């Protein structure tokens, strides 16, 4: 069975390739160019495809590169911009995994003769006695990426390989040092690959996106206490960056897009009982879900016990304990007690 290994040039994907090679797997390297060359790219920086291709040549591995920049702009970047225009907080990494890495890149791998696509994600793929193929949280809690894969179609995940699921990041780095192998592009990837410096505000300004302007900041009691810089710059639950000195810490409670009002309040106003989602991706039939399940609505959040009802148009999540309001546009990932991913959906808003 031939396996394509998605190579970004960094530590994780390189070690995934090495592990498969050491297992005797029939592999080739595959790099996707998701972004056009930057006009301000420093002259000394290597072209990623050339650097990765040279590394594969040293390892005796065939290498292919595919240009998916136009598709990435349409499927990931354009929706990212539109989400901010309408006041949501998008999750482009989850969208990219669903549409690009395990969408078009997997298609490219299959066209090149691969049966599966391996990536450097820290997530486990297991065969469950009742559910068949399942996705499970990675062994490294600090690097687990199951949350970002919860929107990937089950049939696509069945064609994936995740060699790093049982590894921790520090182990991966140590093993590369032991093997005296340096990644061609060793710097850690930034949070959003197409946003320089992870500064989404500057990115949107540079794109000359027409965004809602300033408006009033109003407390939950209806008192105007300041002005915001545009609702797109704020997220539910946010505390920092409000620019207001107040008698108590203030948080963003909600965004009134129709009236361009930012509603703020104390921590006691952040008690969301649940959330609604759309674009639901079921990895396990809800009829087979266990009684005890939990939900993550943010990447760094520990899964929170909840009840989840799946309907024709989405999921309704009801937390056991009140939570910080889930941000519209983010992902709600559903887990069982062992960390198997049961479903994912895009958050419409808190309830």
Swiss-Prot record:
GO molecular function annotation: ATP binding; tRNA binding; tRNA-uridine 2-sulfurtransferase activity
Disulfide bonds: 96-193
Compartments where located: Cytoplasm
Region annotation (Interaction with tRNA) ranges: 143-145, 298-299
Site description Interaction with tRNA, residues in chain: 121, 330
GO cellular component terms given for this protein: cytoplasm
Enzyme class, broadest EC rank: transferase
Pfam short name (any one): tRNA_Me_trans
Keywords: ATP-binding, Cytoplasm, Disulfide bond, Nucleotide-binding, RNA-binding, Transferase, tRNA processing, tRNA-binding
Task performed by this protein: Catalyzes the 2-thiolation of uridine at the wobble position (U34) of tRNA, leading to the formation of s(2)U34.
NCBIfam families per the UniProt record, alphabetical: PRK00143.1, trmU
Protein name in UniProt: tRNA-specific 2-thiouridylase MnmA
Species name: Nitratidesulfovibrio vulgaris (strain DSM 19637 / Miyazaki F) (Desulfovibrio vulgaris)
Gene that encodes it: mnmA
């Amino acid at each position: 069975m031939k396996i394509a290994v998605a190579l970004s040039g960094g530590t994780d994907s390189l070690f995934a390739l090495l592990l498969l090679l050491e297992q005797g797997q029939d592999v080739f390297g595959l790099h996707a160019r998701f972004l056009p060359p930057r006009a301000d790219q420093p002259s000394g920086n290597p072209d990623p495809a050339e650097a990765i291709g040279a590394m594969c040549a040293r390892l005796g591995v065939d290498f292919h590169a595919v240009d998916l920049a136009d598709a990435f702009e349409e499927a990931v970047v354009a929706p990212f911009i539109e989400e901010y225009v309408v006041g949501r907080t998008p999750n482009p990494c989850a969208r990219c995994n669903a549409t690009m890495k395990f969408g078009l890149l997997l298609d490219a791998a299959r066209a090149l003769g691969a049966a599966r696509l391996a990536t450097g994600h820290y997530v486990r793929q297991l065969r469950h006695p009742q559910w068949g193929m399942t996705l499970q949280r990675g062994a490294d809690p600090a690097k687990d990426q199951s949350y970002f894969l919860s929107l990937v179609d089950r049939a696509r995940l069945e064609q994936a390989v995740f060699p790093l699921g049982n590894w921790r990041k520090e182990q991966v780095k140590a093993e590369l040092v032991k093997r005296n192998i340096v990644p061609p592009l060793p710097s850690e990837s930034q949070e959003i690959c197409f946003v320089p410096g992870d500064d989404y505000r500057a990115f949107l300004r540079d794109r000359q996106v027409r965004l809602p302007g300033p408006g009033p900041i109003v407390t939950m009691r209806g008192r105007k206490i300041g002005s915001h810089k545009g609702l797109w710059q704020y997220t539910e639950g946010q505390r920092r960056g409000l620019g207001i000195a107040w008698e108590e810490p203030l948080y963003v409670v909600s965004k009134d897009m129709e009236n361009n009002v930012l509603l703020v309040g104390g921590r006691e106003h952040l008690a969301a009982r649940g959330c609604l989602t759309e674009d639901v991706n079921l990895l396990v039939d809800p009829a087979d879900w266990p009684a005890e399940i939990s939900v993550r609505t943010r990447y760094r959040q520990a899964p929170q016990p909840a009840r989840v009802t799946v309907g024709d148009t989405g999921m309704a999540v009801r937390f056991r304990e009140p939570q910080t309001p889930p941000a519209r546009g983010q992902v709600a990932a559903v887990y069982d007690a062992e960390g198997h991913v049961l479903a994912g959906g895009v958050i419409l808003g808190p309830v």
